[in-house]
């Protein structure tokens, strides 16, 4: 009974499957704080819940970059006292100072998704080093793409030296023309299990989400991963303390615990997203490193952000034309 009296609960709100059980158990053993884990399916559901409770009910939330920006704007997030997170300096600066939290006042990154090109050198003689190579006529009817139109339009913009987030409609139209010229090379556009087309040898090259890249490499270690020379596009998940968190102390304790290098390594191996903790990299197993550790020489990254409605509508129109051309 005595030990039960010492157990304090704290409320974590995020997607399902974001932490290995050994981390949750280890934290409770070390601190006496038990985690009540609540899940949401979509970022928008999380924001609605935070709005409803005016930033109360939960001690720590982990969500996607774009929705965190909105939560901060609505006053639902409290500023962090980073002096209370002794492991804070372990974080990788590549994933900090981003659009949703430019001064790093509110959030701690917890994993990044970076879509990449993966190809089968046994099926093509094209030495792929960037997005531009996907246009090579030698890859006719031999490429699979994921179905996120802002990202696919975005990599086309990158081949033109432009930003994913340009609002220049003439530039976006020019990218649309160029994207149409990629259609002959596209075998499939699909968001679900896109890696299967590459694993089976149905296509020679694919543009895949992080989790799909990991799956493909686990099955086919002979596949080549490309960090495109034109620059990476990525999304970041991050933790924050809601404005009226009932147990902010517990949130700080957990953020500190999961960013200790060995603990962070276990977390990133488990979730399969890119490691946002520099000090954890040496503890990540060699076979996982090529899947979740960003190479030192990787090109600069850029996050897809909210843009004007006019630009957004033009992207959607371009995407529909492209999909029709691929059918």
Q: What is each model feature region?
A:
Residues 144-148, 156, 164-228:
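Ligand-binding pocket segment of bilobal, Venus flytrap-like solute-binding proteins
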Residues 78-89, 107, 221-233, 242-245:
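Short beta-strand->loop
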């Amino acid at each position: 009974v005595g030990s039960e009296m010492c157990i304090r609960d704290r409320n974590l709100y995020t997607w399902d499957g974001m932490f290995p059980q050994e981390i949750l158990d280890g934290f409770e053993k070390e601190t006496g704080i038990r985690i009540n884990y609540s899940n949401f399916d979509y970022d928008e559901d999380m924001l609605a819940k935070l709005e409803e409770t005016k930033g109360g009910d939960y001690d720590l939330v982990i969500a996607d970059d774009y929705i965190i920006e909105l939560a901060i704007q609505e006053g639902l997030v409290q500023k962090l006292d980073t002096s209370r997170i002794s492991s804070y300096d372990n974080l990788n600066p590549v994933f900090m100072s981003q659009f949703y939290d430019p001064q790093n006042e509110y959030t701690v990154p917890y994993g990044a998704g970076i879509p990449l090109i993966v190809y089968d050198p046994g099926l093509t003689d094209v030495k792929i080093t960037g997005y531009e190579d996907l246009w090579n006529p030698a890859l006719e009817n031999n490429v699979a793409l994921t179905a996120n139109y802002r990202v696919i339009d975005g990599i086309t913009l990158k081949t033109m030296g432009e930003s994913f987030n340009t609002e220049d409609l003439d530039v976006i139209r020019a990218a649309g023309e160029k994207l149409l010229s990629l259609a002959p090379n596209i075998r499939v556009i699909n968001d679900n299990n896109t890696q299967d087309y590459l694993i089976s040898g149905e296509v020679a090259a694919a543009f895949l989400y992080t989790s799909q890249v990991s799956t493909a490499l686990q099955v086919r270690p002979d596949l080549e991963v490309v960090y495109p020379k034109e620059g990476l596009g990525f999304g970041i998940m991050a933790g924050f303390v809601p404005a009226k968190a009932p147990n902010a102390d517990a949130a700080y304790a957990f953020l500190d615990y999961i960013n200790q290098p060995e603990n962070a390594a276990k977390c990133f191996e488990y979730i399969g997203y890119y490691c946002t903790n520099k000090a954890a990299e040496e503890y990540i197993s060699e076979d996982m490193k090529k899947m979740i550790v960003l190479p030192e020489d990787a090109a600069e990254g850029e996050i897809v952000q909210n843009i004007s409605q006019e630009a957004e509508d033009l992207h959607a129109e371009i995407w529909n034309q492209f999909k029709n051309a691929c059918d």
